[in-house]
């Protein structure tokens, strides 16, 4: 009795793999998984791991791995299909009968799979010394050639004759994606004069081929045409080998090319797959996330690789969360993974994995690295782009973390590290010449920015008195505060007239810096339209109080031995830090809901 692929997936989703495994061996809970003594080899220390969330088992000892159906097959000696039927009967799951169309589909699928196996056997027999020498120059060993079934499709008519002798016609070869048709109607061997690499699905069945031209012809790589058994948006090269390793290491490495997978696998990185030269799809990501929690993208270090990274980032952002992650390996410019591992060795590539950067760090690298942000327009565009990325994230907690991360990066890289903050169009003087700001000076700027951006807050006498009585470290800002309160706020100058008045004073540069639409000194959130002023004031006030507390604490621990006083300072500091954290969460949650 034949069942559909959809029914296999139904069984994986409906039946907890741990329930099935527990019938054959004792399992002990370990974190989110279960462990026990492997039923497939003798061992004294449990190395057999089962994960209900990933619907997978893996033995660290004998390397046995698979889903609930594969476990049943291995235990019982039944085929995969027979094991699925057994599980369905055991758990009372109805097995749907195949429709006439489904039967025809599976008959055609089986026929295509058989033809592809025959084609691979033919290609394997056509390896010549020239081809083997080429592969050897690429550091591909004889063992690897056999393991990946690398072959060759000659230019002559041997390919067509091979299938004609087996009574397989041109139409059937076309259904298998093995031949092409020219504009003039001529039929030709799709992979003529190319090295062939079989593409296998997760069940180790050949579903298509990739092929590389000998020499410098174009296109360099070809894939089989899509068929009923082969869709590029759902298939990953190397997935049949990588899934168990991905489960073991809790990561998958996603590259672009066949030879990237082969070279990395040969170097010991068996958790590697490739996207068949096409853009990464949502199906690809979900397939890998079922086996692991982290997908590491390792794309070429050129402009095309960066563009591919951006496409994948935009695809992944709505899907990622605190558990399912994307990270990136940044390769040396102009090199692909195959080049890197062959020129620098496995240890070098392992270090690149260790130095991988997170998705948020990759976004910052793409948007910030190698660019100038001298003008307000450039900075505003950067903030807009970062905000657009954040808004694509579905997970609210992760979105909040991204907002915080980018805010911090903007502050660290566009304020503290910049020697000039105001654009070159203005004759910056007092502020722009400073090399960096202390935390206290940052707050002094923020208090002055309040006067400009939220003058309504000064209706609160306590707030006005606090700002008015502050002793600024930056005396230029203090003078600006006094002048602005007296000349603008107290005189109730209309907003439309303020710029013209300030322009005639020595405070114009300061005013320009503080009055920008997205002022960094008040950039607790990216969106100021619905800002809660009470939260903003509490945050600024408590931050100012904390900095002064920390300064007094530093003096107390260095200047005397009043331990009771020191402990009081420490307790108060921790209290304010916690209160600020709560305010941070409130602020960000407000902006993203």
Swiss-Prot record:
Q: Name one GO biological process term.
A: DNA replication, synthesis of primer
> What exactly does this protein do?
RNA polymerase that catalyzes the synthesis of short RNA molecules used as primers for DNA polymerase during DNA replication.
* Protein name according to UniProt: DNA primase
- Could you say which protein family the record assigns here? Belongs to the DnaG primase family.
Q: How does it assemble?
A: Monomer. Interacts with DnaB.
Record lineage? Bacteria, Pseudomonadati, Pseudomonadota, Alphaproteobacteria, Rickettsiales
Q: Which InterPro entries match?
A: DNA_primase_core_N_sf (IPR037068), DNA_primase_DnaG (IPR006295), DNA_primase_Znf_CHC2 (IPR036977), DnaG_bac (IPR030846), DNAG_N (IPR013264), DnaG_primase (IPR050219), TOPRIM_DnaG_bac (IPR034151), TOPRIM_dom (IPR006171)
Q: Which gene encodes it?
A: dnaG
Q: Which organism is it from?
A: Rickettsia typhi (strain ATCC VR-144 / Wilmington)
Enzyme Commission number:
2.7.7.101
Q: Where does Mg(2+) 2 bind?
A: 300, 302
- From the Swiss-Prot or TrEMBL record, what is one GO molecular function term? zinc ion binding
The text the record gives for the protein's domains is: Contains an N-terminal zinc-binding domain, a central core domain that contains the primase activity, and a C-terminal DnaB-binding domain.
Give the signal peptide as a residue range, or say none if absent: none
Q: Where is the Toprim domain?
A: 250-332
Q: What is an example of a Pfam family matching this protein?
A: Toprim_2
Zinc-finger ranges (CHC2-type): 38-62
The record's Gene Ontology cellular component field reads:
cytoplasm; DNA-directed RNA polymerase complex; primosome complex
Q: HAMAP family attached here?
A: DNA_primase_DnaG (MF_00974)
Q: Which reaction does it catalyse?
A: ssDNA + n NTP = ssDNA/pppN(pN)n-1 hybrid + (n-1) diphosphate
What residues bind Mg(2+) 1, as annotated? 256, 300
């Amino acid at each position: 009795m034949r069942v559909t692929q959809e029914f296999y997936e139904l069984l994986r989703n409906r039946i907890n793999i741990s329930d099935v495994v527990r019938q054959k061996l004792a399992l002990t809970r370990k974190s989110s998984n279960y462990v026990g003594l492997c039923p497939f080899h003798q061992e004294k220390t449990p190395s057999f791991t089962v994960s209900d969330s990933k619907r997978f088992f893996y033995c660290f000892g004998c390397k046995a791995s698979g889903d609930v159906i594969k476990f049943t097959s291995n235990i019982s000696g039944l085929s995969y299909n027979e094991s699925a039927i057994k599980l369905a009967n055991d758990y009372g799951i109805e097995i749907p009968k195949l429709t006439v169309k489904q039967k025809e589909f599976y008959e055609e699928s089986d026929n295509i799979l058989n033809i592809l196996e025959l084609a691979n056997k033919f290609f394997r027999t056509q390896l010549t010394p020239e081809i083997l020498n080429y592969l050897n120059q690429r550091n591909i060993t004889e063992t690897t050639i056999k393991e990946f079934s690398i072959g060759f499709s000659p230019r002559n008519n041997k390919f067509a004759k091979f299938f004609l002798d087996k009574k397989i016609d041109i139409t059937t070869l076309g259904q298998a994606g093995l031949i092409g048709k020219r504009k003039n109607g001529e039929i030709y061997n799709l992979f003529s004069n190319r090295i062939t690499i079989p593409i296998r699905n997760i069940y180790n069945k050949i579903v298509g081929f990739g092929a590389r031209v000998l020499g410098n012809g174009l296109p360099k790589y070809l894939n089989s045409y899509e068929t009923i058994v082969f869709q590029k948006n759902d298939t990953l090269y190397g997935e049949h080998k990588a899934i168990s390793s991905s489960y073991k290491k809790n990561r998958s490495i996603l590259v672009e090319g066949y030879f990237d997978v082969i070279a990395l696998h040969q170097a010991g990185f068996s958790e590697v797959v490739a996207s068949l030269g096409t853009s990464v799809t949502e199906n690809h990501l979900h397939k890998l996330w079922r086996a692991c929690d982290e997908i590491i993208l390792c794309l070429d270090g050129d402009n095309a690789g960066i563009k591919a990274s951006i496409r994948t980032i935009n695809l992944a952002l709505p899907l990622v969360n605190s558990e399912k992650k994307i990270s990136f390996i940044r390769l040396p410019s102009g090199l692909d993974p195959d080049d890197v591992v062959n020129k620098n060795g496995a240890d070098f590539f392992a270090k690149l994995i260790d130095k991988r950067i997170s998705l948020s760090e990759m976004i910052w690298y793409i948007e910030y690295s190698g660019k100038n942000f001298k003008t307000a327009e450039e900075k505003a565009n950067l903030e807009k782009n970062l905000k657009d990325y954040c808004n694509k994230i579905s997970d609210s907690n992760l979105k909040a973390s991204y907002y915080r991360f980018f805010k911090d990066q903007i502050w660290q890289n566009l304020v503290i590290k910049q020697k000039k903050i105001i654009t070159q169009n203005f004759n910056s003087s007092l502020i722009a010449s400073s090399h960096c700001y202390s935390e206290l000076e940052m707050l002094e700027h923020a208090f002055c920015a309040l006067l400009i951006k939220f003058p309504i807050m000064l209706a609160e006498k306590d707030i006005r008195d606090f700002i008015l009585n502050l002793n600024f470290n930056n005396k230029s800002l203090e003078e600006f505060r006094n002048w602005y309160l007296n000349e603008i706020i107290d005189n109730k100058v209309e907003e439309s007239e303020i710029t013209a008045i300030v322009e005639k004073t020595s405070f114009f540069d300061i005013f320009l810096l503080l009055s920008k639409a997205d002022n960094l000194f008040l950039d607790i959130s990216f969106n100021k339209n619905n800002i809660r002023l009470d939260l903003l004031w509490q945050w600024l006030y408590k931050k100012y109080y904390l900095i002064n507390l920390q300064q007094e604490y530093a003096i107390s621990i260095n200047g005397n031995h009043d331990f009771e006083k020191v402990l009081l300072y420490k307790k108060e500091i921790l209290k304010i830090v916690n209160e600020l954290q709560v305010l941070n969460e409130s602020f960000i949650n407000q902006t993203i809901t």
